[in-house]
UniProtKB/Swiss-Prot annotation:
Gene name per UniProt: mshA
GO MF annotation list: acetylglucosaminyltransferase activity; D-inositol-3-phosphate glycosyltransferase activity; magnesium ion binding
Record EC number: 2.4.1.250
Official protein name in the record: D-inositol 3-phosphate glycosyltransferase
PANTHER family named in the record: SULFOQUINOVOSYL TRANSFERASE SQD2 (PTHR45947:SF3)
Binding site for 1D-myo-inositol 3-phosphate: 25, 36-41, 94, 127, 151, 171
InterPro entries on file: Glyco_trans_1 (IPR001296), Glyco_trans_4-like_N (IPR028098), Glycosyltransferase_grp1 (IPR050194), Mycothiol_biosynthesis_MshA (IPR017814)
One GO-annotated biological process of the protein: mycothiol biosynthetic process
Family note: Belongs to the glycosyltransferase group 1 family. MshA subfamily.
Protein purpose: Catalyzes the transfer of a N-acetyl-glucosamine moiety to 1D-myo-inositol 3-phosphate to produce 1D-myo-inositol 2-acetamido-2-deoxy-glucopyranoside 3-phosphate in the mycothiol biosynthesis pathway.
SUPFAM superfamilies associated with the record: UDP-Glycosyltransferase/glycogen phosphorylase (SSF53756)
Class of the enzyme per the UniProt entry, highest EC level: transferase
One family name in Pfam for this protein: Glycos_transf_1
Length: 435
């Protein structure tokens, strides 16, 4: 039987109706910047909302961490979160979660069994633990598995911070398994795509690049003065901002050490310099909850450092607007949503020249990419943001333009195409592009 292009498009559109998204280790309802919640949480929620607007329903499976959580919570039309009982009703370290995989998988399979066969057209798993669950669900349901790594053990182990622990062998092996069985692997950037191919042996034809996005309705330029007033920041301050989880990978100490160097080089800055760190301890940083406070004290700069707990998006946007520069000194980032959010608010970025940050930040146009993590080098770059306001303003204009190219609607449209391609390949239907 010969299938016409119009029939192929019809098959694709009819079949892409509902996605089972698996996010075992962290709930999309958690506040980013706390525990294991970060850019991945933002990605899952924002992409799901936009997919639903395209007519693709999304059900997100995550581990239940409290008895008070409902079995199902609708977070937007067409988007629901299913809380699956697996282990104790509490937060668990990621190192303890492999022991709960069987219980979590059982809950996911029981949910699907409540409905008529064919409820889910595709599985999209996030992070390697979820990929293990997705692998087995894929075999049971006969649907394609799309997987996004978000971070990769082999990459992290190549770029370890001085105080960080290497990722365990079990994770490396688990990631290798997921790479081999997934029908499609979604990479945030071409760099990540190449890492999947070079380090994990992924088949190039199964790797798709889909850039994450930014909520341009929330993160947009507004008055810096008004933002500083709301946040009780001096109008004439030089504000250096860090946003993210406090852990060795994110390297917030690099900002503090650079600030200390700036004050040594120019003591007159002390009366106006403000270093703001928005976020909470996470991962390996949980063992040292007072780490940033201790580092600031040891450097003698406690008087210029403000530690702020994780903030909801509308408040976070104000922090970006209030800053002169957002500093992202991570040892690695698969993309770097913080950099994109800051630029969308009109604040340029000083970021480490690693991973996805090379895609998120246009060097010399929307910010500056810094090689290495030497505080002296970072101090020189940050001093330019303080002492060259005209240059900083030019970067701010470039930052807004850079972020405008990364909307979540475009991300969702690309994901829908990836899902369609995976399903067409599974059912041996040739892919046609509608005009």
């Amino acid at each position: 039987m010969v299938i016409s292009p119009s029939e192929v498009v019809s098959v694709r559109r009819r079949r892409v109706s509902r996605v089972a998204t698996i996010s075992m280790h962290t709930s999309p309802l958690d506040q980013p910047g706390t525990g294991d919640a970060g850019g991945m949480n933002v990605y899952i929620v924002e992409a799901a909302r936009r997919l639903a607007q395209l007519g693709v329903e999304v059900e997100i499976f995550t581990r239940q961490t409290s008895r008070d959580l409902p079995p199902v919570a609708e977070i937007a039309p067409g988007v629901s979160v299913r809380h699956v009982t697996a282990g104790p009703y509490e937060e668990l370290d990621k190192g303890d979660l492999p022991g709960q995989l069987c219980g979590f998988l059982s809950g996911v399979l029981r949910t699907e069994a409540m409905y008529e066969p064919g409820r889910y057209d595709v599985i999209h798993s996030h992070y390697w633990l979820s990929g293990q669950v997705g692998w087995l669900a894929k075999e049971r349901w006969g649907v394609p598995l799309v997987h996004t790594m978000h971070t990769m053990a082999k990459v992290k182990n190549l770029l370890l911070a001085e105080d960080d622990r290497p990722e365990p062998t079990a994770r490396v092996l688990g990631e290798e398994q997921v790479v081999q069985v997934a029908d499609r692997l979604v990479a945030n950037t071409p760099t990540e795509a190449q890492e999947l191919i070079d380090l994990y042996g992924a088949a190039p034809g199964r790797v798709e690049v889909v850039n994450p996005g930014v909520n341009l309705n929330v993160f947009q330029p507004a008055s810096k003065g008004a933002a500083r007033h709301r946040l009780d920041l001096p109008q004439d301050a030089h504000v250096l901002l860090f946003v993210g989880r406090v852990q060795p990978l994110k390297a917030p100490d690099v900002l503090l050490r650079a600030a200390a160097r700036m004050l040594i080089d120019d003591p007159s800055l002390r009366s106006r310099l403000v270093v703001v760190c928005v976020g909470g301890p996470s991962g390996n940083g949980l063992a040292r909850p007072s780490y940033l406070t201790d580092v600031a004290a040891s450097l003698g700069i406690s008087d210029v450092v403000r530690i702020v707990p994780p903030a909801p998006q509308h408040e976070l946007a104000d922090w970006y607007r209030a800053a002169d520069v957002t500093v992202v000194p991570s040892h690695n980032e698969s993309f770097g949503l913080v950099a994109l959010e800051s630029q969308a608010c009109g604040t340029p970025v000083a970021a480490a020249s690693v991973g996805g940050l090379r895609t998120a930040v246009a060097d010399g146009v929307s910010g500056v990419l810094v090689e290495g993590h030497d505080p002296q080098d970072w101090a020189r770059v940050l001093s330019r943001f303080v002492h060259r306001p005209a240059w900083r303003d030019a970067l701010a204009a470039g930052a807004v333009a850079q972020a405008a190219a990364f909307g979540w609607s475009a991300t969702a449209a690309r994901l829908a195409d990836v899902y369609a391609g995976a399903m067409a390949n599974l059912h041996h239907v040739p892919i046609a592009v509608s005009s």
